[in-house]
């Protein structure tokens, strides 16, 4: 099973993600960080979700850090 989202204008399936202990006041859907630790996204209730593994349309399943090497996503 996977969730589907859009990252940097690309449709992606999310296969692995974790809710972090951190909180945020950013609007849901805001990219908080994108790097070797994965992609951190603001969610409802001030929670933060880290995307760890994903698959872009037409691509192969990979770690988020590997995806970011070819598809940088701006924070904000």
Language-model segment annotations:
Residues 1-76:
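Internal anion-binding site segments
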